[in-house]
Amino acid sequence: MRTEAKSINFASNTPTLSGTLPLTVAQDFGFFGAESLEVKTVLIRGGPTAMAALVGGGVDYTLVAGVAAVRAIAQNAPMQIISGLQPYMDYTLLGAKNIHSVNDLKGKVVGVTGPGGIAEFAAVEGLAKKGLVRDRDYKILYGVGNSPSRAQALESGKIQASPFSFLERLELEKKGFPILFDIGSAIPGFPFVVIVTSKQKIENDPEEIVGVLRAIQRGLEFLKRNREKVADGIIKKNKFGDPATVRQVINQFAEVYSVSLQKSDVEALIGATRIEAEAKKLGGTEKFYTLQFLTKATEQK
């Protein structure tokens, strides 16, 4: 057992409470400390950039959209998925104020941050489940920017719908933007966020990986049983909005997080990313993930 805490960096794509809560709980309530780890969360916007930092050694692990992870691995990025984290697609499609239903989007424009991102996937797949086909029924517009920019684009009429996270949705609902549908419910059980590390880390520090996953798993169990205690700790930091919002986020996500990962989850990601042919060439689903560390971490509770 290491006596001095080892410092490791975790990249996260989002500064939101829902995006970082599993790491915050594991750090603040001593679960990383019990593994002699000191974890710093580094905000890196965009999955591809976060994974480039991982490959370059700037960070040790990254929380990233599952579809972005399998796409990078299919392009020979030297990394693997080591765990699930959030098997729930945290997106709701919100409309401009003159849009009242999904069918009102026919002939309209849906705005997303950029090509190949999870927001684009969420919007296109979610609308497909509702019977609307991209390019036939509506257009996708890239480069609409972050949440405030997308809300502004809805207001100005540049776009007529856009996907927003739970936290963003709470804010925009107050401003009168209509909810068209919850994408997470339309695409259930999808490995939305996963944990990825480099092949170098897998080869050189297997014990650390087991410790990281065990700490996160214990933190998630603690969160489920101690929502109010976690909420109080987060509220004291005064970083994530008003107490009511913090509690709403914790109640929404406490039961959702799970480190669980199965072959079928990775197959769903490969199918969603439409890279079945590339996956086959690379040697199949096993190329994309490893369960050896998760198995050890969850055995040693």
Which sequence ranges carry the predicted segments?
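Short, glycine-/small- and polar/acidic-enriched structural segments
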Residues: 2-144, 150-156, 160-166, 177-189
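Alpha-helical scaffold segments in soluble metabolic enzymes
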Residues: 22-25, 53, 122-125, 153, ...
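A generic alpha-helix surface/boundary motif
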Residues: 26, 66, 121, 195, ...
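Secondary-structure end/capping motifs
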Residues: 203-281
